[in-house]
Amino acid sequence: MFITDEHWRVLKPILEPAQAPRRGRPWKDSRAVLEAIFFILHTGIQWEHLPKSFPPKSTVHDRLQLWSGNHAFRKLLAKVVRSLAQKGRIDLDQCFIDATFAPAKGGGEGVGLTKKGKGTKLQLIVDGQGLPLGASLAAANVAEWHMVQETLDLFSDQTEPERLIGDKAYDCDELDETLAELGLEMIAPHRKNRRPENVTQDGRPLRRYRHRWIVERTFAWLGARRRLLVRWEKKLTNFVGFTLLGCLSLLLHRLS
């Protein structure tokens, strides 16, 4: 079982409709469906191999598409992050940002060609403990700094970080200016081609950069969710849904 009674009390208001649909088949138990989605997320099994102890695979797949399409998983992640922040369990003093590559074996939406092959880029923002606060996906050939705003869009006023720490992929004056307008400091080592007269970082803020292993560890945690290792979903929104659920699974046990 992936979902405890305490977890479900938090998740139910967003996932469970106030009134079941009047047309079509009866509305299956949302908790059982979510358990099935978590099972696929963790094991990486194909849909046709979903055990019969779960609701039918067609029901589970349809609900994944529904919840991914109506941003239910985004709302859940934001809600849990906000709840943890209110309890003082989120470290917003310094947050880390990075991206990784997920090969897309079956192609589909939002797939880009790189030296590693065709795939999708996953960007994460984590707090000082490595807890995922926001995630976004794009074609693998999209520059990482272009994805930052979308990743930040998951945040509320209560969960905005004070500073972001990233690698050279985030050394961009335009990004620095955009984040500064939001009251957020971007810390990243300079690219080799930056001219000396345009240097914006000194050694003091960059001392925080040595802790970037924190976000790399979070990617390793997510890698234990086998459905995220390779993208099989044709629809980008469905892979986004699995990704956000992976982040959510890392946060739920902190609610206790």
Where are the regions that the model predicts?
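Short alpha-helical elements
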Residues: 1-256
